[in-house]
Swiss-Prot record:
It is an enzyme of class 7 (translocase). GO terms for cellular component: plasma membrane. Residues 11-261 form the ABC transporter domain. This is Putative peptide import ATP-binding protein BMEII0206. SMART domains: AAA. Transmembrane segments: none annotated.
Length: 332
């Protein structure tokens, strides 16, 4: 999908930071996150486990425990800053204007309520539907996400369904409020390849039919490349590269992005060992003072010990690694 650069953003995230309280004090988990999301656009958040993707997504709707977390920056939806909104107004937006599909439906769905009751709850809250009217709409939603034998299965409990069916139920709950933005956090985790493809095809169809914007969180670069318009690559709590999905895959600017792409095995190659990025993401309390990827980077230089701000480039691109910009024109 081609998004006009002149389209006003639906969501605008500026200088987002997230800290968590620990026994040793406050620890920063995510910082310096900036991005926009246009109407009907799909943005992929990409990175290894521990890169800050899910922490970023949960913070957009203030879903972290307020007693043990603190948020910085701003998240503006249609001009309203979600970080300063009254709880009553935020509740109107959650699940209605902005909805979320979580990565682990078996732990997200209520085990003591039927799937029908759980869908009807959102319909009552956001649309005022009751009784038969709510049940009829719940059946329509389950049918829309392709749950078979809906009239019977609407009264089943989550544990009676397969992983793929539970994820479809989560999607039905998410779209019940007719959201403008859908956040999908690793929606295909723990599903086999065939079911993964079915879930992604379902999300693609719903996105187009309902004219939604989507934030897709995934460690699977191949999946993101087939679904997203743009990508934001995260490492150790920071974005390290953003840009149109085709540009990121064809001409990665940051060594971490290049490493992720190189780690995708080619089925035509006869490999004794899968390609990997050496090392691991540092713990939040042990991040290096300069470039956070430098200890794992084969291109590291002396200047990498200094903080690396992300630089905006032509073509809607940005990177946190100046040495990897031989052909780009910096606009800062």
């Amino acid at each position: 999908m081609t998004i006009s650069l002149k389209t006003a953003p639906l969501l605008e995230v500026s200088n987002l930071s997230v800290d968590f309280r620990t026994d040793g004090g406050w620890i920063n988990a995510v910082d310096d996150v900036n991005f926009t999301l246009a109407p009907r656009e799909t943005l992929g958040l990409v990175g290894e486990s521990g890169s800050g993707k899910s922490v970023t997504a949960l913070s957009l709707l203030r879903l972290h425990d307020q007693r043990n977390s603190r948020l910085g920056g701003s998240v503006r939806y249609k001009g309203e800053d979600l970080f300063t909104l009254a709880t009553s107004r935020l509740q109107q937006i959650r699940g209605h204007e902005i909805a979320m599909v979580f990565q682990d439906p078996i732990h997200t769905l209520n085990p003591v309520l039927t799937i029908g009751r759980q869908i009807e709850e959102g319909l009552r809250l956001h649309h005022g539907l009751q009784g038969r009217e709510a049940r009829k709409r719940a059946i329509e939603l389950l049918d829309r996400v392709r749950i078979p034998d809906v009239a019977r299965r609407i009264d089943e409990y989550p544990h009676r369904m397969s992983g793929g069916q539970r994820q479809r139920v989560m999607i039905a709950i998410a779209i019940a409020g007719d959201p403008k933005i859908l956040i999908a956090d690793e929606p295909t985790t723990a599903l086999d390849v065939t079911v993964q493809a079915q879930i992604m095809e379902l999300l693609r169809n719903l996105r187009d039919e309902l004219s939604m914007s989507v934030i897709l969180i995934s460690h699977d670069l191949g999946l993101v490349s087939e679904f997203a318009d743009r990508a934001m690559v995260m490492y150790a709590g920071q974005p390290v590269e953003t840009g149109p999905i085709n540009k990121i895959f064809d001409e990665p600017l940051h060594p971490y992005t290049e490493g992720l792409l190189s780690a995708i095995p080619d089925l035509d190659d006869d490999l004794d060992r899968l390609p990997t990025i050496p090392g691991s993401i540092p713990e939040p309390s042990r991040r290096p003072p300069g470039c956070r990827f430098a200890p794992r980077c084969t291109f590291a230089q002396a200047s990498c010990v200094k903080p690396q701000p992300i630089m905006s480039l032509t073509g809607g691109r940005a990177s946190r690694c100046p040495p990897r910009l031989p052909t780009e024109e910096c606009v800062l």
